[in-house]
A protein has these predicted regions:
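Surface-exposed loop and turn segments in beta-propeller and other repeat-based domains
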Residues: 1-15, 54-72, 110-129, 166-190
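Asp-box/WD-like beta-propeller blade repeats and closely related beta-sheet repeat scaffolds
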Residues: 34-91
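Structural motif
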Residues: 37-43, 96-101, 151-157
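Short loop/turn segments immediately following beta-strands, especially the blade-tip
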Residues: 41-52, 107, 157-168
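Structural signature of eukaryotic scaffold interfaces centered on beta-propeller domains
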Residues: 20-24, 74-85, 129-141, 191-200
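Conserved beta-strand positions in repeat-built beta-propeller and related beta-rich domains
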Residues: 31-35, 90-94, 146-149
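Beta-propeller domains
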Residues: 139-164
Length: 200
């Protein structure tokens, strides 16, 4: 079966969701629709090696994550980037000042990291737009490379076999030109673009 329908007409999702999560017990899957700001819930059951699921409903959810069901875990966007030692890094959709989450080999959260790429003076407690910092994320060995689309910035992090995270280097290639209006990050007309291609 299908978890959802996609399109501009009636359906559970208006576009492909970029948020997913599971309940602590793994019996419920959540998918977030960015266009409608609704969180769709599905009951999941595995029996005789078959996966079945049913739509439970949806509820409005604020962009900062308020309204998420208690116990939702594995909050991330797009694909996970997996390192050679089994650790993974996911881009955070709902966050408060950090961009990434480091997961262990069993996809349990280890820590959050990666500060927002704008001056802290521009932000307040209601600013949660981590999606503005999305970009290219690649791995090589146990190294993780990040180059955002909207900022002339690049960074490399290493993760040890014990899960210790270290920033090896970061570089700014251009000065961003941004402002915050009504808690929304605004890129000015003269803001230099970041990266849309990266190879390691």
């Amino acid at each position: 079966g299908f978890l959802s329908s996609v399109g501009n007409g009636p359906g559970e999702l208006n576009r492909w969701p970029y948020f997913s999560g599971t309940s602590v017990h793994g019996d419920t899957v959540y998918m977030y629709d960015n266009m409608s700001h609704k969180l769709n819930a599905y009951a999941v059951q595995i029996k005789d090696q078959n996966l079945t699921y049913s739509f439970l409903g949806n509820k409005p959810t604020r962009e900062n994550g308020d309204g998420l069901p208690e116990g939702v875990i594995n909050q991330m966007a797009f694909e996970l980037v997996r390192l050679e030692n089994g650790y993974s890094i996911g881009f955070r959709v709902f966050s408060n000042g950090t961009i990434f989450t480091l997961f262990d080999k069993d996809l349990n959260e280890v820590k959050k990291f990666g500060e927002y790429l704008v001056d802290e003076g521009l932000m307040d407690g209601e600013f949660h737009q981590s999606i503005c910092f999305q970009g290219l994320r690649l791995s090589r060995g146990n190294s993780f490379f990040y180059a955002p689309h909207n900022f002339g910035y690049m960074a490399r992090y290493d993760v040890s076999d014990e899960g210790e995270l270290s920033k090896v280097w970061e570089r700014w290639y251009s000065e961003p030109s941004v402002s915050v209006d009504n808690n929304n990050l605004k890129f000015e007309a003269d803001n230099p673009q970041g990266f849309y291609g990266l190879a390691v």
